[in-house]
Amino acid sequence: MNVFEDCGSTQCRAIRQQRGQYVSYLEQNWKGGFDMGSSGADLSFVNLGITIEHLPNSITLFGFRIAFYGIIIGLGMLAGMAIACSDAKRRGQDPDLYLDFALYAIIFSIIGARAYYVIFDWDSYKDNLLQIFNLRAGGLAIYGGVIAGALTLMIFTRIKKISFFSMADSGVLGLITGQIMGRWGNFFNCEAFGGYTENLLAMRIRKSLVNPSMISAELEQHQIVEDGIAYIQVHPTFLYESVWNLGVLLFMLWYRKKKKFEGEMLWIYFLGYGLGRVWIEGLRTDQLLIPGTGLAVSQMLSAVMVLIAGSVLFVRHRGLRRKAGTEA
């Protein structure tokens, strides 16, 4: 059961208040990793025999603490730009055009991703508005970034008088590359996980490293104590999504030479990513909910996206087959 199902309850409000306190807790206690005064491991994939004794979430350079969350997202952006520019060059387009777009897209996508997250988790920020600007503890929603990026591309292509769908077809290859890498920022932040599981990929996390608002009643019931240290055992949904997105990217790289119309890669991205997000989001304990409901906003948005993308692809391909039959 998700602890946020009853968003009007006193328990829900109390848990949401803990999130703001948790950010301060991270600032005070996680300076490149917790010092718990114990030899217990921070994290392990118990059924794979993989143990991480100490999981840092940042590094310090010249006195400045840099979160791995931000580093990984930055690396994902660079890798995404490289993939998009490479595909643009293959198609005879000017890669510099994509670099110019990226300067705007990165800024507005980060703003959009943060705004989306804050809007649907407003109770965690309304009493401490400055925390809205603290990105080191996480809190970027990919759909907010995608929406902002799409709007930016619409404006950019209109100004440059070029095809929106033509740029989008190469752009989504870079986008999903960034998503593949970016999810590992969630790993270092010990977030974006699901409920209790005993499957092959089950991940066990030291409970004290986790934001209390992300720990569902189910996880509390299945709490594991080893050598006096409490752990939760979860679905590593960040890993599921990263691997799923890798599969979508590989398919798109294979299919791109076979595409039938401009914009097809964009719709394939929406369909492929949406299908994965529908089921993965259902596993997560930190879902952003539509106010007044128990519905996960990203899961609902994914379902709508799948229906629209699937319909567009079906109609366009049927039209192309009919046209080919008529010409024959």
List each language-model region with its residue ranges.
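Basic polycationic patches enriched in arginine
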Residues: 13-19
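Terminal transmembrane helix and immediately flanking juxtamembrane interfaces
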Residues: 5-6, 17
